[in-house]
UniProtKB/Swiss-Prot annotation:
Homodimer; disulfide-linked. GO terms for molecular function: cytokine activity; growth factor activity. InterPro entries: Cystine-knot_cytokine, TGF-b_C, TGF-b_propeptide, TGF-beta-rel, TGFb_CS. Belongs to the TGF-beta family. Transmembrane segments: none annotated. This is Univin. It comes from Strongylocentrotus purpuratus. Glycans are attached at N50, N116, N336. It comes from the Eukaryota.
Length: 395
């Protein structure tokens, strides 16, 4: 079953589980377990009470929300009926993106500490085994944030070097840059008075860790003050100041991955064509009033009400909508029925025992972005498709 369908069913059942019979509650919990597995979670995540999402992930979430709202606004002139893309069911050779997944993986290594009077070091360890193998990693970046030292305007830049450790190293140990176990991945310069926030591409390294778990010995972050023109005392002082705020220096692995699924070719039926074929007077339907016709209705799903607010960061709920209403005979184009639905309605009108009536169902769906903690307290931003009903029709 598609993840979005499972999620919708689970949320509806969880909302009514408290007043339900024991068997119903058991079924609800089983459905919850299923959706958690589909999401790559072994159980309900239980992040620490003070756990927060990095600002960077919040920014990405808001960007996705803005893009979604912009797309919705551009469709504002369309009606809920008559904008369907018909699917002919033929498989296509291409694949389409099922979901975009962005994870912020926190490191479990040592502390940032002075290695000498002009540099600091930190060993970074990242658990990439938590990324499901069903996902294809598209990008992997080390995101570094070093706070600004406004008093450091009189010192040169910082050289930030990232090395891959090719053998096991004790945490909080000082590693010589001449050590043969080090492989330089990248070096960037940072103005300490302005601080630094940026990413370094380490996709090849992460892929090597993923293909061979025993090769994951982590990274070495080496931060060194460039030459202070003989003023070693000032350089040493700046390094001490930076060391004092080392807890504010952050290093996270940002992994972008995707899941793919087979797609189907679609034949577009444009709105203008549907309107030109529609009956001039929709009120002429004999068996249903306008208010009872198949249409979209509001349905707000609250994650707080189902007890998921501890691990879902955003949104706390969303408008899912649902389809309900009659599909009367004759079935007009404005009810967005397929050719099959029109034929089925005709046969049903002749002999209602031969075939059932067609049903009011979603004909166009859109996705939502969710920001949440996984079982390893990684922050995940994921786009789930087919979560919001955009249009309804008779099927």
């Amino acid at each position: 079953m598609d993840v979005s369908k499972v999620l919708i069913l689970t949320l509806i059942w969880l909302l009514t589980a408290d007043s339900a019979p024991p068997d119903y509650v058991t079924l609800t919990r089983k459905m919850e377990s299923k959706i958690l597995r589909v999401m790559g979670l072994s159980e309900r995540p239980r992040p620490k009470p003070n756990a927060t999402a990095p600002q960077y992930m919040w920014d990405l979430y808001r960007q996705q929300m803005a893009a979604t709202e912009g797309a919705a606004a551009s469709r504002g002139g369309e009606t809920e009926i008559g904008k369907e893309e018909e699917e002919d069911g033929r498989p296509c050779s291409e694949t389409k993106l099922s979901s975009n997944i962005i994870r912020s993986v926190s490191h479990t290594g040592g502390d940032l500490r002075a290695s000498n009077s002009t540099s600091l070091q930190q060993i970074l360890l990242f658990d990439v085994a938590s990324i499901p193998h069903a996902e294809t990693i598209e990008a992997a970046d080390l995101r570094l944030e070093i706070p600004a030292l406004p008093s450091a305007t009189d010192v040169p830049s910082l050289a930030v070097r990232i090395y891959q450790l090719e053998s096991r190293t004790r945490l909080n140990s000082i590693v010589s840059l001449k050590d043969k176990r080090l492989r330089l991945l990248d070096v960037v310069l940072a103005d300490l008075s302005q601080g630094y926030a940026g990413t370094i591409d380490i996709l090849s390294t992460v892929n090597s860790w993923r293909s061979k778990k025993t090769s994951n010995h982590g990274l070495l972050l080496h931060v060194e003050l460039m030459s202070t023109s003989g003023n070693n005392r000032r350089g040493s002082q700046v390094i001490k100041e930076l060391g004092a705020i080392s807890k504010k220096c952050t290093a996270n692995l940002i992994v972008t991955s995707s899941e793919y699924r087979q797609c189907s070719k679609r034949n577009r039926r444009n709105k203008r064509q549907a309107e030109s074929e529609a009956p001039a007077d929709i009120s002429s339907f004999p068996t249903a009033s306008l208010t009872n016709l198949c249409q979209r209705h509001r349905l707000f799903v609250s994650f707080r009400d189902v007890g998921w607010e501890n691990w879902i960061i955003a949104p706390m709920g969303y408008q899912a909508y649902y389809c309900d209403g009659e599909c009367p005979f004759p079935l007009g184009e404005r009810l967005n029925g397929t050719n099959h639905a029109i034929i089925q309605t005709l046969v049903n009108s002749i002999d209602n025992r031969a075939v059932p009536k067609v049903c009011c169902a979603p004909t166009k769906l859109s996705g939502i972005s969710m920001l949440y903690f996984d079982n390893n307290e990684n922050v995940v931003l994921r786009q789930y498709e087919d979560m919001v009903v955009e249009a309804c029709g008779c099927r």
